Every structure is written in structure tokens, then in C-alpha cells.
Amino acid sequence: MGDFVFCYGSHNRKLFSKYIVSTKNSHKFYFGKKQYIDIEIETIFSQKYIVVDFNDSLDFLNFIVDNEIYCNFTNNKHECESLEFHHNYLNYITQHKHLDIVKIFYKKFVPLIKSGRGVQSLQFCILQDIDPEVVKCVFKNGSLEDTKDFIINEFHKNPDITIEFMDEIISIYKHKLTKLFMENKIDKSIDNMEISLFQFLIPALKKDDVGLFNFIIEEICNLTSEIDKTKLDKTQLGYLESIDIDFGIRDINTLIDYYMLCDFDDCSPEDEMYFCPNIFRQLIFSLDNLDSLAGRILFDIPEYNVVEYVGIICDFIGETNPLLINKMLPEAKSTEMAQLLIDCGADYEKLYESKKFSKCNSCVKKLIKELIKETSDS
């Protein structure tokens, strides 16, 4: 468990030939005249591999990185399962918190693999839960294109992300972006590196944590603050503009519509929708008025029967917009929703006398009929 398995195909065999001394029962790999490790040479799926015990794996990893030894995939005849074995090894070192090896793996070994395979990015999937320190180590030492999906996946699966953790992750992201711009290494591939504001907000949405939400917004809005814009050309400035965040009404509409609003009784985790009454309240009360809110949102809320959101809207408008309250009442899908709107001033008598009444939900019609009856009896 934790062995490092490396391809021993014809290309690598030639490069390793002067370092391996084999006898009938053993194989020794010499780093120098006196320094060596015991290795195994095994045939797996018709391909030979060097198998290095975990305790010796860091020395071996450093050796192949320093000597730039990897499979030659420019030869179309070469096939091996190296990536699967690298993936298994990575899962082991992340699970057991071997930060020194994780650092070398992402900082030096992954670029070597990419060079050998002729690919621009290489994203390993780490399925198990890992320590936050390991997450930060991976993100710090790997390139953005190699770790973007990894960190987004952590945002989704880790239920206990803190402000302190996000502070470090955003700082790493900011440093990497700043360096890429200052070294003129940003091009159209920025899409493969950019992590959207909404992905950063997932940890706050999952917990409906206003403090974490505010912190992330503030930090992401200052993401490009250390980039000297006077040193960028027109193209670079265009790329910078594409990632510059100024959290405004467009972002608020997107956040509510695509991340915070659905039929929560019928949502699955794959839908990535989050019930966030605390964050929703803050967003609504940050508006001058509801006119800037996308119209469909105001009518999807009663349609999806999100009573708490309607209560927040009612608190926000008070008695200043009876027309909106009256428009929302026919859309109500529950007695609780209808009663809330009526308590906020919705004219149920006017609705009762209109053609819209027949199209109302049965529970809403029942409630209004009872109220009409009570009024007439009194």
C-alpha cells in the first residue's frame, strides 16, 4: 500500500539501465556509488513496471524529476497504465498527509508527466476527504489549470470550510493570477484557470453563512488589486477585465436565480441549489428597490413555494408596493404562502372577484373562500 509504481517500458529501461543492478532474487536501484534502494520489477497487464516501497518513494520521485525521466508518448506504440498508478499513489499521500511528497508531486512531477504526454493540463481526482492542510498544499504547489477542478470539488464536498481556510485559498489564487499577469503568461487559456465568484461562494451557500459570504465577496472583489495595470498591454487588460469582479445587481440576479431558487422539495444534490434565507435577506436588503431584481425571480419564489423568501420580500417592501403583493397572491402554492401575502396586505377580495381566482391553487381558493365567508358572516 502506497508503493510508487513507474513504467519500465523500453524507453525508460534504457535510461535506467546504468542505475539498476539485478541478481537472481533482487533488484537494486543506485542513486550513486553507495546510495541505493531495493526495488521490484513486476509485469502488470503485459507491461513491466518498477515498484518502489513507499518509504523509498520520495527519493525515487526526486531522482526521476531531477533527471527528467518519463515515458515517451511521442511513440504511438507505447501504452502503459502509469496514470492510474500515479493516481493511486496521490490518493495515498494525500490521505496520509505526506505534505513533503504532495509538494514534489504537484510542483515537479505533474509538469514532467504533462511534458511527456504533451498535454496542457492534468487533473487528478482525489475522491476521499482530506485534511485542509493537504488541500492548501495541493492548490499552492499545483498550477491553476491542474488544480482548478480539484479546489472547486473541495468547495462542494467539504461541509466545514471556514473563513480562515478561504482566506488562504483566495490568497493563493490571487498570488497565482497576479504572477501570471505580471509574467505575461495569461492568454485565452484563462478559462481553464479561472474560478468563478459563484464557485467560491459555494461553501457560504451550503451553510447559509452570511459572515463567510461577505468575506468571500470582499476578497474576490479585490482579486486583481495587486496587478499593475500600467504594465499590461491591451490584450492583457482585456483578460484582466474578464476576471475583475464588482459584485452588483447582475451578479445578485445570477446568484439567486441559478444557485438559491428552486422547488426545494424536489431538488437533488446534483442540482446545486441552496436554501439560504439569511443570505437572501442580505441580498434583498442591499437593493434600492425590487425593480432591479429579475422579474421571473419574484414569481418563481411563490411558484416554488419558498415561504421564507416571500416573508423577506414582504419585510423589505412593507406597504410600499401593494401591486406586487397582489400579483404574487395568485401564484401561491400553499395556504401558508397565501396567508403570509394576505397578512402583508394582498387584496384577496379583489382576487376572489377576478377571473384569475379560478386558476389559483385549490388550497389558496379554499383559504380565500373561508376568509370571504368569515367577512360576510361578520
Swiss-Prot record:
Belongs to the mimivirus L17x/L18x family. This is Uncharacterized protein L176. It comes from Acanthamoeba polyphaga mimivirus (APMV).
